[in-house]
């Protein structure tokens, strides 16, 4: 939660730290956001992450702690796996780096025989790139995402609309798919809508 006051901004993180708040700093200014990806183009550097339940006041002179953080944290793992933008960092861990490392470890240990690996965009791509490196196989962009007119497939309230969005948002490339043993990395774990449709297409 962020509150704008006459003498600064009060930033408060939820008691369990499930969602992040990160403080950015540049000459003569501080900023607070839930996504560190908003900082680079504005000239801010990450200064610190608020702890669970921590409250601070930001002003031009610095950061004043109003409440100390709780000891226990229950941050949402979906931030790295699903929701997070690739350039964002949560608790000092970059989203794309976590996805890549997860795929890398799978590729190093998986015994499946595959010709190439593919990622279901967007968040499955980082994991697939890591898998390809760990497995020693090429990465192919066999499914592309068309986003100008469609929201995230898990957000519509009706299943009929979720299924339509999932179907229309991803376009398979037959030239990259046909005759190949493919391994797909997918993050369709909220409702599983895209996973079911992609299996049918393949």
Go through each PLM region and give its residues:
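Generic non-transmembrane alpha-helix signal with a bias for helix starts/N-cap capping motifs
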Residues: 124-125, 195
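PRPP/pyrophosphate-binding module of the type I phosphoribosyltransferase fold
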Residues: 164-202
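N-terminal segments that mediate ammonia production and transfer
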Residues: 1-124, 132-167, 172-173
